[in-house]
A protein has these predicted regions:
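Conserved phosphate-binding/catalytic region of the ribokinase-like
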Residues: 1-18, 217-329
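Glycine-rich phosphate/adenosyl-contacting loop at the front of the ribokinase-like
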Residues: 2-87, 325-329
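Active-site metal-binding loops of divalent metal-dependent hydrolases
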Residues: 23, 147, 177, 269
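Short, conserved phosphate/pyrophosphate- and ester-handling motifs at nucleotide-, phospho-/glycolipid
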Residues: 56, 205, 267
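Conserved N-terminal subdomain of the carbohydrate kinase-like
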Residues: 62-147, 171, 315-329
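Hydrophobic faces of well-ordered beta-strands that scaffold small-molecule active sites
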Residues: 65, 173-175, 202
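A generic structural signal for short hydrophobic patches within well-formed alpha-helices
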Residues: 122, 131, 149, 180, ...
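Conserved phosphate/ATP/ADP-binding segment of small-molecule kinases
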Residues: 169, 179-250
């Protein structure tokens, strides 16, 4: 197995990952019914960074979520849900003047459509001052995504400060490109490349890399040439495979075969699984496998956060040979 060559320094009491970003209340028809046909809506929460924090907690990695919520019933629901998943939410601040963001899902066989109501939300008012939080200063890893800089000018400044301003002693950083075209007036090609180049660990889908930076990025190795600076770059190729580049070395692990219920949240789950492997000193191959099996748990449910396999099954999946892995459903 190929080692990852680099990983964040671990203090005596172990790693702590702090995930920074917006989480909204999510409304969706139950059982995948189209919005126009449903008689009711189920309420859940949705946020890329809090998804990562919750899955890290599932993997017994200490995690914190840092954000802002409105002083409203939706904000209290979000806080309760994430806290109940085992995530430290003590750094979340309440804004009495701004609401908690909201999204509505409309299931469709061609792909779930999502409508966002987040303009002027409490989280959109976050800025670089968030980085002074003790929850961040005492963490060993910060995780952000490309969603945050799309929310507002101050959130863009937050992302730039977190990833690009690197004074001595700053925690390691993880960045999921997570390009959402609907959040941008035009593709933020240079901004997201700048943020990715500045991070220690980067996640990007091959398809989103092509959408952002051109069809010339045909393979994972092309993306590595375009993003040479991250210590670890993970390129995901959907249902095919994921490749981790660690310095000049690389390792590829095929995706698990999954009967997909809904793809939303799978990328966050993969990132959390891989980071859990990294922080637990697993090899590149085992970290990728942990990413895949965590993503599979999200793909099998309608929400963003699904249950992991039992610990014994996880160990079996990490230990089986590549043929057995490829045959697993």
């Amino acid at each position: 197995m190929t080692d990852l060559l680099w990983r964040p320094a671990a203090p005596a009491d172990g790693h702590v990952a702090a995930c920074v970003g917006e989480t909204m209340v999510a409304l969706a028809p139950p059982d995948g019914i189209a919005l126009r046909q449903t008689a009711g809506l189920a309420l859940d929460v949705a946020g890329a960074e809090s998804n990562v924090a919750m899955y890290l907690a599932d993997h017994e990695v200490r995690s914190r979520w840092v954000s802002r919520l409105g002083d409203d019933v939706f904000g209290r629901r979000v806080l309760h849900r994430i806290s109940a998943a085992g995530v430290d939410v003590t750094a979340v601040r309440t804004d009495p003047d701004r609401p908690t963001g909201l999204l509505v899902k409309d299931p469709d066989p061609a792909g779930t459509r999502v409508s966002y109501y987040r303009r002027g939300s409490a989280a959109s008012a976050m800025g670089p001052d968030v980085l002074s939080s003790p929850a961040l200063r005492t963490a060993t890893l910060w995780h952000l995504t490309g969603i945050t800089p799309a929310l507002s000018d101050s959130c863009r400044e937050l992302a730039m400060a977190a990833l690009c301003d690197r004074p001595a002693g700053r925690p390691a950083t993880s960045f999921d490109v997570n390009y959402r075209p609907s959040l941008w007036r035009e593709p933020p090609r240079e901004l997201l490349r700048t943020l990715a180049q500045a991070a220690d660990v980067v996640f990007v889908g091959l398809d989103e890399a092509q959408s952002l930076w051109g069809d010339g990025l045909r393979e994972a190795t092309d993306v590595r040439e375009y993003l040479p600076d991250p210590r670890i770059l993970v390129v995901k190729d959907g249902a095919t495979a994921a490749t981790a580049f660690c310095g000049d070395a690389s390792v590829t692990v095929p995706s698990l075969k999954v009967d997909v219920v809904e793809p939303v949240g799978a990328g966050d789950a993969f990132a959390a699984g891989f980071l859990a492997g990294l922080l637990k000193d697993q090899s590149a191959e085992r970290s990728l496998r942990t990413g895949h099996l965590t993503a599979a748990s999200a793909l099998r449910v309608t929400g963003d956060h699904g249950p992991l396999p039992e610990p014994g099954e996880r160990r079996r999946l990490l230990d089986i040979d590549i043929r057995g892995w490829c045959e697993t459903r």
